[in-house]
Every structure is written in C-alpha cells, then in structure tokens.
C-alpha cells in the first residue's frame, strides 16, 4: 500500500459534507493499494444545458480524486494544492453514473502527478485527466 495516511471510505466521504463534492453527489467507492475511485451521478446537477455531462463536472471529479489521493500521500502538517489540471473528453454521457479511477504517475517530495480516468456505466473511457499537485508544509 502506498498511502501514508490510513483512512476508511467512510472517513473519506465524511470530508465531503457541505462542499462542492457533496453537491455534485461524488462518493468515494474504493481505496486500493495504489488506487482511489469515486462515482458521480450524471443528472441535473452535473449536466450542461444540452443534457450531457458537463466538462467542468468531469474536471471536478478528477480534481477531487487527485487531491484526495495527494492528501493520502502526505504526513501530518502537510497538505496538497492543485497546480495543473488537464482533461481530454472522449465520449459524451447523458445519464447514469461515471466512475473515476485515480492512479499515481509521479510521487515526489514536493510535487505529485495523478492520472484520473473516467468511465461510463458500460466501462467505456469518457475522459482522461492529469492533475499536478504541490506538497505544502
């Protein structure tokens, strides 16, 4: 297991109360040895005006996953802040849920890079993101 902080899924989900994460319906669903996953509904909260998943909602899911994964890689007295987010949208999604899978690309002392891939309910890749974070403290 790569994580320096040891939290349960319930503890991770509790951090979302009264935040954008909760408003969008994002729920952490898996914390594996080197992976963090979450789901987000594709509904009125996350649609753009034409009834499709809003790219900003996809970006919010990606940044949520990458930032939390980054936090799990810090020690007491440290935190992470996002420095760059890149998202490539591959496929439109109009309903159901999307699942985000976050994996590390680089875990340095001062910066991290995360790859977050979003999948629709049929397991098709709909968005690929990369998040850079800086370790503070």
Swiss-Prot record:
Its EC number is 3.1.2.-. It is found in: Cytoplasm. GO terms for molecular function: 1,4-dihydroxy-2-naphthoyl-CoA thioesterase activity. Gene3D superfamilies: Hotdog Thioesterase. Its main location: cytoplasm. GO terms for biological process: enterobactin biosynthetic process. Belongs to the thioesterase PaaI family. This is Proofreading thioesterase EntH. It comes from Salmonella paratyphi B (strain ATCC BAA-1250 / SPB7). The gene is entH.
